[in-house]
Amino acid sequence: MATAQLQRTSMSALVFPNKISTEQQSLVLVKRLLAVSVSCITYLRGIFPECAYGTRYLDDLCVKILREDKNCPGSTQLVKWMLGCYDALQKKYLRMVVLAVYTNPEDPQTISECYQFKFKYASNGPVMDFISKNQSSESSMSSADTKKASILLIRKIYILMQNLGPLPNDVCLTMKLFYYDEVTPPDYQPPGFKDGDCEGVIFEGEPMYLNVGEVPTPFHTFKVKVTTEKERMENIDSAILSPKQLKTPLQKILMDKDDVADEQEHYISDDFDVETKMEEQKRNLGSSELGEPSLVCEEDEIMRSKESLDLSISHSQVEQLVSKTSELDVSESKTRSGKIFQNKMANGNQPVKSSKENRKRNQLESGKTVLYHFDSSSQESVPKRRKFSEPKEYV
């Protein structure tokens, strides 16, 4: 038992560094936070098969880490996308990564779910002006506090992903990168990406905006947000969401909006007992897979076990991800975590057409309405095109 615990502690240290006192250490942490977050999401949403993941531990939390696998071309492509993100991140150009799920391979601009990962950098040396509204900007955060915040964020992502209703059977992934235009060279593109030319996207159903949380260090801050179909939130435990509940906005939302618009979002609560919730769900579901909650893409796996922190990146082109989720029974859906969701039925044997399908049909009849704009800022009276990147090739 002691040996197993020691091994888990060692693996945890491999995922998140124990000490954050230099900008390089902070960069490693932020890169791995991005990798583990993407891994958690893609595993629990059933986007890739088990063979695409390795195993790591965060304290007592067993996580799945995305890796390149010859039997899963999709995971290999996502790993290459992540390497492109790392290139922009280390240059301090990267402002936001948007990982989007869509269902029609011919229409990647109509999305069903998306995940935003935002980055901030300390411009004049290490600062801590983003700790809390209730703390002084002169406050300091210890490495232990940073690691605790990192693990809490991953646990919150895990709980949210496990409780969301399942995605459709067949889904595709795309990724968009946004930059700090004032410092990013106009001709810069990360490996595997090209200049984006899409002005906006359509959300398939009624969107729900969730602010999952953030992790600050003296040199960076990392924030995670999720947008999902409102119907997938029907089985979410009310204790998971913050008491601050506001109406879901139906009007246009800026994908690269600044934090001034955060009051439009629901917040994943910091107050509920994450560990108790996870243990309770393990007992209720009795799933062997739930004992190994999944996360994806830890840096060591992405770099194919290279121990050096050298950030050399392959220049191979990135293709669009197309992958299938597990087959779902017509009367019930089961997520990767083992949780079962009953489908609504009519006449005992036919699925009821969802309001999402009705809304989508109405959109097609009346013309699509752009819900997300990628190229403008919420603080600009006249929207200005902002630089962003997308994968070079689509399948």
Swiss-Prot record:
Q: How does it get modified after it is made?
A: Phosphorylated at Ser-378 in a SPO11-dependent manner.
Domain spans labelled HORMA: 24-226
Q: Which Pfam families match?
A: HORMA (PF02301)
PANTHER family in UniProt: HORMA DOMAIN-CONTAINING PROTEIN 1
Composition bias type Basic and acidic residues, residue spans: 354-363
Give the GO biological process terms: blastocyst development; meiotic cell cycle; meiotic DNA double-strand break formation; meiotic recombination checkpoint signaling; meiotic sister chromatid cohesion; oogenesis; regulation of homologous chromosome segregation; spermatogenesis
Where found in the cell? Nucleus; Chromosome
Spell out the Polar residues composition-biased ranges.
Answer: 344-353
In Swiss-Prot or TrEMBL terms, this protein is called HORMA domain-containing protein 1
Residues modified as Phosphoserine are: S377
Please report, in chain numbering, the residue ranges of the motif Nuclear localization signal.
384-387
Q: Which SUPFAM superfamilies match?
A: The spindle assembly checkpoint protein mad2 (SSF56019)
Q: Which InterPro entries match?
A: HORMA_dom, HORMA_dom_sf, HORMA_MeioticProgression
Q: Which species is listed as the source?
A: Canis lupus familiaris
Query: What sections of the protein cross the membrane?
Result: none
Tell me, in one coarse class, where this protein mainly resides.
nucleus
Q: Which stretches does the entry tag as region Disordered?
A: 329-395
Q: What does this protein do?
A: Plays a key role in meiotic progression. Regulates 3 different functions during meiosis: ensures that sufficient numbers of processed DNA double-strand breaks (DSBs) are available for successful homology search by increasing the steady-state numbers of single-stranded DSB ends. Promotes synaptonemal-complex formation independently of its role in homology search.
